[in-house]
């Protein structure tokens, strides 16, 4: 069976004119260049309308998003692209992954993912704010999503004033990021098959705790 990576566009507006949509396209191209299948889930599209109805019960929310939840749980890996809204992921995206966590087996480890986050402010400035709030007792990872283990978080700052050349450069980086993500998964699989590393699944409570810590930010603007 072909390996499958699901790209989640977390922007509430699924328009192809949005920069998040362009980043998803670039990531998908990188995945396909490595021979993997790249599926796409639009949080702001018709596929997940119920996540915008915050007044509904969690049971109804879970039922109506069964298709989206199933696609997330069946993926070998995730890439989640979203804009920073009010200091965190958009509420609709958070609600979707709360439903994912409810649907997962309690003993199942979180799904590995790369996060790509766009924002209006400079990324380095925001990163310094994350560390400051973490020391004051607030949650250390503002990008935490239920059921997800973020292996890598990429911040793209100042998108509202970014030149066209810079935007295109970030699209190339997203393409390369996808290729590295696939290469890492393939390398881990080969080591396990050859016996170089004994497969070991960390307890769910431990991986969830790790996911809540300050994100591992590998690039910023």
Give short role names for the model-derived ranges.
Residues 17-19, 126-130, 163-167:
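Short, solvent-exposed loop/turn segments at secondary-structure boundaries
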Residues 65, 93, 131, 135-136, ...:
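A structural signal for well-ordered alpha-helical scaffolds and beta->alpha junctions
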Residues 106-146:
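Short, glycine-/small-residue-rich phosphate/pyrophosphate-handling segment
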Residues 1-103, 161, 172-221:
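N-terminal beta1-alpha1-beta2 submodule of the flavodoxin-like/Rossmannoid cofactor-binding fold
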Residues 4-8, 117-120, 153-161:
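A short small-residue
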Residues 37-42, 148-157:
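Short beta-strand elements in bilobed, periplasmic/extracellular small-molecule ligand-binding domains
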Residues 76-77, 112, 152:
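Well-ordered beta-strand positions
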Residues 27-35, 140-149:
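Short helix-loop-beta junction
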């Amino acid at each position: 069976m072909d390996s499958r990576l699901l790209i989640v566009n977390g922007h509430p507006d699924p328009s192809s004119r949005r920069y998040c949509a362009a980043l998803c396209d670039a990531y998908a191209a990188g995945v396909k260049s490595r021979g993997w299948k790249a599926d796409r889930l639009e949080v702001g599209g018709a596929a997940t309308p119920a996540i915008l109805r915050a007044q509904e019960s969690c049971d109804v929310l879970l039922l109506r998003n069964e298709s989206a939840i199933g696609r997330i749980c069946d993926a070998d890996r995730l890439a989640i692209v979203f804009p920073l809204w009010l200091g965190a992921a958009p509420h609709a995206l958070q609600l979707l992954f709360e439903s994912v966590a409810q649907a997962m087996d309690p003993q199942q480890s979180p799904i590995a993912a790369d996060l790509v986050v766009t924002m209006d402010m400079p990324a380095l400035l925001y990163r310094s704010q994350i560390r400051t709030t973490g020391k004051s007792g607030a949650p250390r990872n503002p990008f935490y999503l239920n059921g997800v283990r973020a292996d890598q978080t990429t911040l793209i700052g100042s998108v509202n004033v970014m030149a066209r050349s810079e935007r295109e450069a970030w699209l190339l980086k997203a393409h390369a990021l996808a290729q590295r993500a696939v290469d890492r998964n393939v390398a881990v699989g080969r080591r396990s098959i050859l016996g170089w590393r004994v497969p070991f699944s960390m307890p769910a409570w431990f991986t969830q705790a790790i996911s809540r810590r300050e994100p591992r930010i590998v690039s910023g603007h």
